[in-house]
Amino acid sequence: MKSVRYLIGLFAFIACYYLLPISTRLLWQPDETRYAEISREMLASGDWIVPHLLGLRYFEKPIAGYWINSIGQWLFGANNFDVRAGVIFAPLLTAALVTWFTLRLWRDKRLALLATVIYLSLFIVYAIGTYAVLDPFIAFWLVAGMCSFWLAMQAQTWKGKSAGFLLLGITCGMGVMTKGFLALAVPVLSVLPWVATQKRWKDLFIYGWLAVISCVLTVLPWGLAIVQREPDFWHYFFWVEHIQRFALDDAQHRAPFWYYVPVIIAGSLPWLGLLPGALYTGWKNRKHSATVYLLSWTIMPLLFFSVAKGKLPTYILSCFAPLAMLLAHYALLAAKNNPLALRINGWINIAFGVTGIIATFVVSPWGPMNTPVWQTFESYKVFCAWSIFSLWAFFGWYTLTNVEKTWSFAALCPLGLALLVGFSIPDRVMEGKHPQFFVEMTQESLQPSRYILTDSVGVAAGLAWSLQRDDIIMYRQTGELKYGLNYPDAKGRFVSGDEFANWLNQHRQEGIITLVLSVDRDEDINSLAIPPADAIDRQERLVLIQYRPK
């Protein structure tokens, strides 16, 4: 009966965190609107080989992540939950692997369940795992690859070892097809310390070629198909998206070496108090083969991405699967022997919740700020934000009431965040970051437009997805569409600021022309260098400017 209660509790936990609240959150630009529109266009065009965004070639990522997102939209339809359905599926599958791997290592069902709950409740896992980007997919393939490698190395027969390495190659191949060649580098770096300390080079050299073969065979069909359709895809994807993005001086998202330290700290909430002890205990038990494997799996990718010039929090998502296992193992040890770390964890969660409550008041309409984040008419959003942090502090306090038994309720600290964050976003943020909000406000004006132009790729993708049309024209800025706009068949999909007046004169008689611009809050739209408009509708950071036929 206890096992049944645990399972019911786990399913309720998943429903409250990963299923029920997702549709209440509008899509964020530029990431979620971009991936939603790419998958919508894939379904609409039937082209499952070449990724397109706004009808233009889009070579920033390979195809597999778009396949999964497209299947989600195909199965469930076009709404906010369905855009995120594939992404949500990825951390849940990863959590299943965490359960399986923990059972393999320690043969303890309670520990396996705890590791799963810790993984799914980690702040970084939840934040990225419910956000429609490709990183949860690549994290799943990386975790699956590490599980496959362990399975292969623990097998006692040549058949078992061969099957494990073949499976490793398939997961690496799917990782390459999801986000590129980092899916090859990260697993290799992660296992090398373990292979060296355990002196398992022989198995690696004997069976490793099977992983290479299965990886190549996994990528080959689509790899050849994309070369036949778009011969320059691999050149662009390798040199621009890999070398330039991570290694060169002009790499995207440049950040210092220590960038991931605060990411690890924030990402480990609501289990931050256990982090030092988990890592220290793991290091102290480094003679244990499984512990070395988990430590190497956690630390090596972290060091690799710290050395790289380009950094984003999403890059280290796969590190948190082994970290969750280490945290769970240490938590049970602490509960038995020394609950001090569990008490510290409770106080950290209380402090985080109280700090959030105070910060919410400071930026609320009743706080000291001259320009509050929320306006007076958004009082209910302020109370939602207060509720988020109040619940966080409450469950932090509850874990201290009988710490040896209640410490695991820290998993419920983010419950308010999961249920209420969609209702607490300030209008001033929604108006700039949620194109759906803008579309809802201006639907009657946008719908009959013959041409729609905008100066933001994220807004363009949001307009395209909401209006179910891919002919949005870029105005003045090309952004990440620069490469796709260079193709001869993309002529007419970009209008510069200097050309706009002439372009308007040439196309005005064809129908309503709508210009959607991103502006600063204090910017005077009358000073914009554009022809006089027939209608202007300003929604804070986004402005709709319309020209009717004359």
Curated annotation (Swiss-Prot):
Pfam families: PMT (PF02366). Its main location: membrane. InterPro entries: ArnT_tfrase, Glyco_trans_39/83, LipidA_mod_glycosyltrf_83. One of its GO terms (molecular function) is 4-amino-4-deoxy-L-arabinose transferase activity. Its EC number is 2.4.2.43. The keyword Cell inner membrane applies. It is found in: Cell inner membrane. It is a multi-pass membrane protein. GO terms for cellular component: plasma membrane. Pathway: Lipopolysaccharide metabolism; 4-amino-4-deoxy-beta-L-arabinose-lipid A biosynthesis. Keywords: Cell inner membrane, Cell membrane, Glycosyltransferase, Lipid A biosynthesis, Lipid biosynthesis, Lipid metabolism, Lipopolysaccharide biosynthesis, Membrane, Transferase, Transmembrane, Transmembrane helix. It comes from Shigella dysenteriae serotype 1 (strain Sd197). It comes from the Bacteria. The keyword Transmembrane applies. Catalyzes the transfer of the L-Ara4N moiety of the glycolipid undecaprenyl phosphate-alpha-L-Ara4N to lipid A. The modified arabinose is attached to lipid A and is required for resistance to polymyxin and cationic antimicrobial peptides. NCBIfam families: PRK13279.1. One of its GO terms (biological process) is response to iron(III) ion. It catalyses: 4-amino-4-deoxy-alpha-L-arabinopyranosyl di-trans,octa-cis-undecaprenyl phosphate + lipid IVA = lipid IIA + di-trans,octa-cis-undecaprenyl phosphate. Belongs to the glycosyltransferase 83 family. This is Undecaprenyl phosphate-alpha-4-amino-4-deoxy-L-arabinose arabinosyl transferase. The chain crosses the membrane at residues 7-27, 86-106, 111-133, 137-154, 165-185, 204-224, 255-275, 288-308, 315-335, 346-366, 382-402, 406-426.
